[in-house]
Design a protein with these regions (language model features):
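An N-terminal, well-structured beta->alpha segment
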Residues: 5-103, 198-226, 236
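Gly/Ser/Thr-enriched, mixed-charge loops and adjacent short helices
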Residues: 10, 14, 18, 34-43, ...
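Conserved phosphate/anionic-ligand binding catalytic regions in large, soluble enzymes, centered on
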Residues: 39-59, 143-146, 232-244, 300, ...
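N-terminal small/polar loop signature for handling phosphorylated ligands or for N-terminal nucleophile
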Residues: 87-150, 247-307
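Short acidic, glycine/serine/threonine-rich loops at helix termini
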Residues: 97-102, 127-131, 149-155, 176, ...
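Phosphate-binding and adjacent anionic-ligand microenvironments
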Residues: 288, 292-294, 314, 334-519, ...
Length: 558
């Protein structure tokens, strides 16, 4: 069916008033390009579930797309013989609460018991609920840190991890088999609530989650003197983060007022990503005013955490790699000192995260495992330990994109856990007369200076994906002989499935002091290049990264 015919069918069948008005406002001639974009395909479903711009159309996030995806998920649970129970959480985004309720209605109509959080909660609380109730799946309605125009639908497996590629393919097939209008079962929310096929998640589940997070503490000293500024960036983090901080005695917490309450329009922060300085500007201003020891920011679904710390006359933003290394070293040091370091400890990070983690791991005798990009792969490593009866070996996992997890209580990155650890670590270093900036500099002195940078190359136009593929093919066929003035000594092609990892379209180039990893975005025509350099000073490491970037940009024609 053509995009135009699909548009006409939706115009005739859509009952939602807002979506009907949106479709009615389109003119078949004047708005032909927009109709094509809205209806030329179904919104893609992958390991990250669905994510797209809100609006009417098969290529948009709306109630009909969500219902159809849920119908496919219900069919998958039955076909796979998984428990017919599904936990549901949602964030502060536009439409999230409604999408969560519609998800519950479709599940209940298909005989799947839906456990729904009664209010917005962090993504890690969803991962926890899946395991708490023994569910076959979980759904979190969120688009993470995308702009306000987006929403999404993340699916989790029975282990509390985002679903595998194989599971995503199976769910996708069931979704494609269901018609948006005639192929979806739906029941009354009130009736399903009355008969128990929809159940509201109780406070006992959330309390148990916070208990599990609190048990990740590795120091019981006084934290009351720590002064913290916190911004949930108008997302889900306020309640859980402030509750966990109160539990461990961090009581001097000032919220950024304009960003304290849920608001899916993100009025003060168009791109609510704690990796970006712009997202933390209001927090930085308040931190300067209150002379805070620490600024924390969590993204809308509270699975990523950014931080800034005093450094001289101003504040310094710690990168995801720096925070990962700080937390890793702190956990190793504290658990070694208090006698709780497990035998044969395991830490996990991704292939694009800093090599400094290897130096920390070697120093403390920790086995460091590296996975493909995406925290679900870190969660899978915890699952492997669990199946071997060795869950206690898991010490810490992190990725460069601001995701951290210090326990097996959930299987996704957890900013509630990260906030607890970061505050505790800052309080502990305070007793040593050090700020976190000074602590990071001390680690650089101890392990060497590591610089990490990310470059995104957007290949616009209709042939963007093809050009991206051609660039990677050319790099594989003829990789550069030198980078940053050094000979390339190693080329690793993850397409062949290196180190026991699944085959992935990733290429790694190494010299004596520099590393470049190239991979496609996966969802858009964008190449991502991760630069890493190790040197005697940060200036030298930065110069190596800059030189490698110039070389690769020239190779890519940038």
């Amino acid at each position: 069916m053509t995009a135009l015919n699909t548009y006409r069918r939706w115009l005739a069948r859509v009952e939602d008033d807002a979506l009907r008005a949106e479709l009615s406002a389109l003119d078949e001639v004047r708005d032909a390009a927009q109709i094509e974009d809205r209806f030329y395909r179904d919104l893609a479903f992958g390991t990250g579930g669905l994510r797209g711009v809100l609006g009417a159309g098969t290529n948009r996030m709306n109630v009909y797309v969500v219902r159809r995806a849920t119908q496919g998920l219900a069919a998958y649970l039955k076909a796979a013989g998984l428990p017919l129970r599904c936990a549901i959480a949602y964030d502060s985004r536009i439409g999230s609460a409604r999408f969560a309720r519609e998800t519950a209605r479709v599940l209940a109509a298909n005989g799947v018991t839906a456990y729904l959080y009664p209010r917005l909660e962090p993504t890690p609380a969803l991962s926890w609920a899946v395991r708490y109730y023994g569910c076959g799946a979980g759904v979190c309605v969120t688009a993470s840190h995308n702009p306000a125009a987006y929403n999404g639908y993340k699916v989790y497996g029975p282990d509390g991890c985002q679903i595998t590629l194989e599971a995503a393919d199976a769910v996708s097939k069931h979704i494609r088999a269901a018609d948006h209008f005639d192929g979806v079962r739906l029941c009354s929310f009130a009736d399903a609530l009355a008969d128990g096929t929809i159940r509201m998640i109780g406070e006992d589940c959330l309390e148990a989650f916070l208990d599990a997070v609190e048990r990740r503490s590795v120091w019981d000293g006084d934290r009351s003197a720590l002064r913290v500024v916190y911004t949930p960036l108008n997302g889900t983090g306020r309640e859980c983060v402030t509750r966990i901080l109160r539990r461990i005695g961090v009581t001097d917490v000032t919220l950024v007022p304009e960003q304290a309450w849920p608001d899916g329009s993100f009025p003060t922060c168009p791109y609510p990503n704690p990796e970006e300085r712009a997202a933390l500007e209001r927090g930085l201003a308040l931190a300067r005013k209150t002379r805070a020891d620490l600024l924390l920011g969590t993204d809308p679904d509270c699975d990523r955490m950014g931080a800034a710390v005093p450094d001289g006359e101003d504040y310094r933003l710690l990168t995801g790699n720096e925070m990962g290394v700080l937390l890793f070293d702190y956990l190793c040091r504290r658990r070694s000192e208090n006698g709780t370091m497990p035998a044969r400890p395991v830490a996990v990070t991704t292939i694009v995260s800093t090599d400094m983690a290897d130096a920390v791991a070697a120093h403390y005798g920790v086995e460091l495992r590296r996975t493909l990009t995406g925290f679900k792969f870190i969660g899978e490593q915890i699952g492997e330990l669990e199946r071997a009866g060795e869950t206690e070996r898991y010490l810490f996992g992190f990725e460069e994109s601001y995701g951290y997890l210090s326990g097996p209580h959930v299987r996704d990155k957890d900013a509630v856990n990260a906030a607890l650890l970061c505050c505790e670590m800052a309080a502990w270093y305070r007793t040593q007369g050090m700020t976190l900036a000074q602590a990071m500099d001390a680690l650089y002195e101890k392990f060497g200076y590591y610089r990490n940078e990310l470059q995104s190359v957007v290949l616009s136009g209709e042939d963007g994906m093809e050009r991206m593929s051609a660039i990677l093919t050319a790099l594989r066929a003829a990789p550069p002989h030198t980078l940053a003035g050094e000979r390339v000594t190693r080329v690793r092609d993850y397409l062949s499935g290196l180190d026991g990892l699944p085959a992935s379209d990733v290429l790694e180039l190494r010299t004596a002091h520099t590393k470049v990893i190239v991979r496609p975005s996966g969802t858009e025509p964008k190449l991502k290049l991760y630069y890493s350099a190790h040197a005697r000073t940060m200036a030298e490491a930065a110069a190596l990264c800059a030189a490698a970037r110039r070389d690769m940009s020239a190779r890519l024609g940038e």
